[in-house]
Amino acid sequence: MTDSEHVGKTCQIDVLIEEHDERTRAKARLSWAGRQMVGVGLARLDPADEPVAQIGDELAIARALSDLANQLFALTSSDIEASTHQPVTGLHH
């Protein structure tokens, strides 16, 4: 493929963070190839810890993105199996 044949592709990931009491929930929404996928991550404040909102946000976001990645791996595995009619054995995540 030459530079003149290069085609860029994009996807969009939006993350919504909601806090209620001492719980934080993040939703990571992936929009790509006409599909929508949503990963969810939760975090809660341990009563023994000092409340630092950023830490709860980071943990909830990381968990939401991890959930989304796992869903994308599962979708990819299904697509490979549908295409090859063989079980997928070498897909690592």
From Swiss-Prot:
SUPFAM superfamilies found in the cross-reference section: Rv2632c-like
Pfam families the record matches: Rv2632c-like (PF08962)
InterPro entries xrefs: Rv2632c-like (IPR015057), Rv2632c-like_sf (IPR038070)
Stated family: To M.tuberculosis Rv1738.
Protein's UniProt name: Uncharacterized protein Rv2632c
Species, as recorded: Mycobacterium tuberculosis (strain ATCC 25618 / H37Rv)
Lineage: Bacteria, Bacillati, Actinomycetota, Actinomycetes, Mycobacteriales
